[in-house]
Amino acid sequence: WIMGHMVNNINQIEEFVSLGANSIETDVSFDKKANPEYTYHGTPCDCGRDCLRWEYFKDFLNGLRKATTPGDAKYREKLILVVFDLKTGSLYDNQAYDAGKSLAKNLLEYYWNNGNNGGRAYIVLSIPNLAHYKLVTGFKETLKDEGHEDLLEKVGHDFSGNDDIPDIESAYKKAGVTGHVWQSDGITNCLPRTLKRVILAIANRDSGSGIINKVYYWTVDKRSTTRDSLEAGVDGIMTNYPDVIADVLSEAAYKDKYRIATYDDNPWETFKA
């Protein structure tokens, strides 16, 4: 999965997919009542990027729905996965459940079109704080209450705070999550970071007894870091330059080992070579 980083404006969806992304990451900020309000990152952000692009969340979901609904003029077949980077840092811990509830209602109405030929992309809810695990509970219970439990098949999870993996496993246990787990590791492109924790996450993924199904590394803009990530065995690379990642994937060392995921590849299944 080539994951376009910080895609917060509808026009950027097309831009990143054209460069080779089959997945995008979108920042979601919340208002004081725990309702998702904007797709917005703000400053500071990655070096070399405009941090201030934004949409209202509902408008972004409408644009995203069009880009992922077969038959729509804006449809882009390659775009199969969306990571919502949920900026819950502005919320009190006790608002996490409500944030999940509101997020589910928004996605149901504006992205899934109330279950009537909505967008088809898989969705990862990425939460920066383990204490906010109730966001997952609120999200799941709301979809069930609304009669759309089937849509949970399209939803996965990530805790993005670079926490210790046993702590992440215990947060999932509290949230009642047993699968559909992506694990991120990384840091802004302005700073270097080793692959130490990525390697631990991959070991958990491949152990057969861990909770992790997929591992992605962010933010990777250099060819050398891309190669290191592929050597380690990641499933996804988040980047500001999808064309760089696509380029490296076509190199002799990788083109037979890796391919770009399509809609038929289940993002919740651990890949077995």
Swiss-Prot record:
It catalyses: an N-(acyl)-sphingosylphosphocholine = an N-(acyl)-sphingosyl-1,3-cyclic phosphate + choline; an N-(acyl)-sphingosylphosphoethanolamine = an N-(acyl)-sphingosyl-1,3-cyclic phosphate + ethanolamine; a 1-acyl-sn-glycero-3-phosphocholine = a 1-acyl-sn-glycero-2,3-cyclic phosphate + choline; a 1-acyl-sn-glycero-3-phosphoethanolamine = a 1-acyl-sn-glycero-2,3-cyclic phosphate + ethanolamine. The keyword Endoplasmic reticulum does not apply. One of its GO terms (molecular function) is lyase activity. It is found in: Secreted. CDD domains: GDPD_like_SMaseD_PLD. The active site is at 5, 41 (nucleophile). Keywords: Cytolysis, Dermonecrotic toxin, Disulfide bond, Hemolysis, Lipid degradation, Lipid metabolism, Lyase, Magnesium, Metal-binding, Secreted, Toxin. One of its GO terms (biological process) is lipid catabolic process. Disulfide bonds join 45-51, 47-190. Expressed by the venom gland. Binds 1 Mg(2+) ion per subunit. Its cofactor is Mg(2+). Belongs to the arthropod phospholipase D family. Class II subfamily. This is Dermonecrotic toxin LamSicTox-alphaIC1.
